Amino acid sequence: MSSKRHVAYLVNISARAERDLAALYDEIDAGNSAAARRWYAGLKQAIVDLEDQPYFWPVTHEARRLRHILYGRKPHSVYRVIYRVLEKRKIVEVLHIRHGARSEFKTSDLK
């Protein structure tokens, strides 16, 4: 029996989502709080887990071609990780990360 892990999809994080992650790290002060670092690490792990189950999370109500992870605890700390699945290429592209309390996004916000 092989212990190799099969990865079905490659997860790519867009430049926009990388900036979102960096800003979020600063916003929650993860450099100075162990709890914030654990929360942030959990968010990043949820993104990595998309390589195995990209269709687990629901489609967004803004655009049916997009999906989102809802990460955190309600009501104050839920973040949305907006992504799309490029099925033919077996790629999950993370496009944007935003606080769940923010207004709906426009697809033009994802650039």
Tell what function each PLM region has.
Residues 9, 20, 68-71, 84:
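A general secondary-structure boundary signal
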Residues 1-42:
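Arg/Lys-rich, positively charged N-terminal/basic patches that mediate binding to nucleic acids
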Residues 20, 27, 46-49, 68, ...:
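Residue-level recognition of specific faces of alpha-helices
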Residues 45-75:
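A short, surface-exposed loop/turn module that caps and links secondary-structure elements
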